[in-house]
């Protein structure tokens, strides 16, 4: 199953991706979560078998969250250089696996994580592009899952589809975009192209609904994704509420527009 906060449970293994349960900023009064979206705290999380971090930006790697999960996390997989943060924050280096683009890590039990490119950047405060950013494919005994991370549209989506045909799930960025950022964040038209390139059975648009990092209306990404789903039902786009579980082994239909005000 997959929950909206990018928590997956597959074959009794719990996988958590880029968890941020606090502010997405080094300053507590910037990028605070929308009211009603902070449904979970790190203390609510069960033991995590695999923690995947796609890059080191504040809205994907949060000190307060990961340190509270430290004693309940079995393995961390991240791009090159990001493991330094985890070591500094007290994680056991033996439980940290850094990967470069094109590398992979076998985790046992039929689980393998593949590190692949993304078109983005990295940096925290004044440390720009000293660590790598990436997308990942998590291969399990029953599923192939693509984790797009952040980034603009490029040929890497088609490359991943050729290397990993018949993807079961794609988790794609959909939100916090701008024409000025089109090379580092996908625009709505780019999401459509990425969905077509990957050809995954199910697509979960994320990176929306919790923080305002761009100037577009907060619900615009959801409306665009819903329109894409209506235009192309075969795309398998799913837009669950935050925290709502979705069975990955079923083809559930698109839920109602939960983000709109109920009609009287």
What are these language model-derived features?
Residues 19-21, 56, 118-119, 149-151, ...:
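Active-site metal-binding loops of divalent metal-dependent hydrolases
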Residues 13-56, 63-68, 78-81, 123, ...:
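Pre-active-site segment of Zn-dependent metallo-hydrolases
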Residues 1-6, 10:
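Single conserved hydrophobic/aromatic residue that forms the stacking wall/gate
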Residues 38, 45, 50, 75-84, ...:
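Cap/insert and terminal regions of metallo-dependent hydrolase folds
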């Amino acid at each position: 199953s997959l929950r909206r906060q990018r928590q997956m449970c597959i074959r009794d293994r719990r996988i958590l991706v880029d968890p941020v349960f606090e502010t997405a900023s080094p300053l507590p009064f910037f990028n605070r979560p929308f009211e009603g979206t902070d449904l979970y705290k790190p203390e609510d999380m069960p033991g995590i078998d695999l923690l995947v971090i796609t890059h080191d930006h504040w809205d994907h790697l949060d000190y307060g969250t990961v340190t509270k999960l430290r004693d309940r996390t079995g393995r961390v997989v991240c791009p090159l250089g990001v493991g330094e943060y985890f070591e500094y924050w007290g994680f056991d280096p033996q439980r940290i696996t850094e990967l470069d683009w094109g590398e992979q890590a076998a985790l046992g039990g039929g689980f393998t994580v593949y590190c692949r490119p993304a078109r983005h950047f990295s940096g925290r405060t004044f440390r720009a592009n000293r660590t790598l950013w990436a997308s990942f494919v998590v291969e399990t005994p029953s599923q192939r899952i693509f984790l797009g991370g952040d980034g603009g549209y490029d040929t890497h989506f088609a490359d991943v589809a050729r290397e990993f045909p018949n993807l079961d799930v794609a988790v794609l960025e959909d939100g916090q975009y701008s024409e000025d950022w089109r090379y580092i964040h996908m625009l709505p038209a780019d999401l459509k192209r990425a969905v077509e390139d990957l050809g995954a059975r199910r697509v979960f648009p994320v990176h929306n609904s919790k923080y305002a990092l761009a100037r577009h209306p907060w619900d615009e990404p959801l409306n665009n994704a819903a329109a894409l789903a209506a235009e192309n039902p075969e795309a398998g786009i799913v837009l669950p509420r935050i925290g709502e579980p979705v069975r990955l082994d079923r083809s559930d239909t698109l839920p109602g527009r939960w983000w709109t005000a109920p009609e009287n």
